Amino acid sequence: MAIYLVGDIQGCFNELSSLLLQVNFDRNNDVLYLAGDLVARGPNSLETLRFVKSLGESAKVVLGNHDLHLLSVHAGIKKAKKSDNLSALLAAPDVNELMDWLAAQPLLQEIPNTCSNSNAINQANNNSAYMSHAGISPQWQLSVALEQAKFIQTKLASSDRNTWLALMYGEKPNDWHQAITEIERFRYSINAFTRMRFCFTDGTLEFEQKDSPENITLTNIVPWYELSQTINNTSWVFGHWASLMGKSSHPNIYPLDTGCVWGNQLTMLRWHDKKYFIQSSELSD
């Protein structure tokens, strides 16, 4: 019985399958945590969604920005780009069922230390870590992140899903203290959970830079995890930031996006012993 955590798949289903074979994943006993961006750009988004959904309680998903974009495209709010590579998924006979399932997934998951049974997964554990697609806002305490994740999940699972999806676009407010209305809190929280990489030194969100920190010459921005107080007391697992290539200067941080869809590799982490498993991308030159 083990907990495995995997980075951004983005439709790279063959690489995911190879990793699961590497670790002898047992869906009846093991649990797979997925750091978001299950879909887009890669060749097999439909197969990825169908498989993860089929795992039932053995899969714990957090939504990423590409997953949310897919929901918006399906709802007619946004148009798919050719590079999104979503045509087969959107034309699938079970697309509505898949979208309902996807929309019901959270933006934040707790990762327990043990995996003895399904109940243990749902029990609060003071020593456990957390996973979200991009991280946790340095302007939040953990209690606020949990509250906002529940708030968003409720909205996206409601009959007003499409209304809320349309409201999530935009980069303002990028300061939690200026997020006064319900809509502003929704948009800020979506951005913090799924788009954040760097923050300005006052903790506000910065959206332009995607490079690794060592390549950034700007002095007024830092990685979100260098400002967060939450991660001094708990570990955080996230994806989204491919240029980190799984590396971080902070001991409680576990970046798992290693750019499989860009031809690099898909990374999986076995939680109890922190052992990494790597599968090279089939999209490499």
Curated annotation (Swiss-Prot):
It is an enzyme of class 3 (hydrolase). The keyword Nucleotidyltransferase does not apply. Keywords: Hydrolase. GO terms for molecular function: bis(5'-nucleosyl)-tetraphosphatase (symmetrical) activity. Its EC number is 3.6.1.41. CDD domains: MPP_ApaH. SUPFAM superfamilies: Metallo-dependent phosphatases (SSF56300). InterPro entries: ApaH (IPR004617), Calcineurin-like_PHP_ApaH (IPR004843), Metallo-depent_PP-like (IPR029052). It catalyses: P(1),P(4)-bis(5'-adenosyl) tetraphosphate + H2O = 2 ADP + 2 H(+). It comes from the Bacteria. NCBIfam families: apaH, PRK00166.1. PANTHER family: CYTOCHROME C5, PTHR40942. Hydrolyzes diadenosine 5',5'''-P1,P4-tetraphosphate to yield ADP. Belongs to the Ap4A hydrolase family. This is Bis(5'-nucleosyl)-tetraphosphatase, symmetrical. It comes from Colwellia psychrerythraea (strain 34H / ATCC BAA-681). The lineage of its organism: Bacteria, Pseudomonadati, Pseudomonadota, Gammaproteobacteria, Alteromonadales.
